[in-house]
Amino acid sequence: MAAERRRRRLSMGMACLEKWAATASQVEKNAVYEALFAVSDGSVRQSHKVLDDVQRNGEYFVVVRDNLVVKVGIHPFNTFSIVYIGSLDDSPDLDLDVA
């Protein structure tokens, strides 16, 4: 039997999630929750488009839907945090300078 990979636990960012969820549609909530579960179980890079934040080591954006991203931070001891949830256009630290 193969060793089971340890899941990451959400350690910070619940207030961000709750604030965003108060105005989000059920479809958007389901998509974000799916992405967060993928971060937790380590499959996010296989299931979603991921954009590394080159300015902040250990943080990346998960593209959830058109114009909806979740920014997460990866921390020691198998934990992660939610940094931002919202539109791609308003996301912090994301510079998509496409010519």
Located regions from the model:
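Enriched for short, Lys/Arg-rich terminal
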Residues: 2-7, 64-99
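Amphipathic alpha-helical interaction segments
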Residues: 28-29, 41, 68, 92
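Generic structural motif
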Residues: 10, 52-53, 70
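Arg/Lys-rich, positively charged N-terminal/basic patches that mediate binding to nucleic acids
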Residues: 1-37
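A short, surface-exposed loop/turn module that caps and links secondary-structure elements
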Residues: 37-63
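A broadly tuned preference for mixed-charge, low-complexity surface segments
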Residues: 12, 24, 61-67
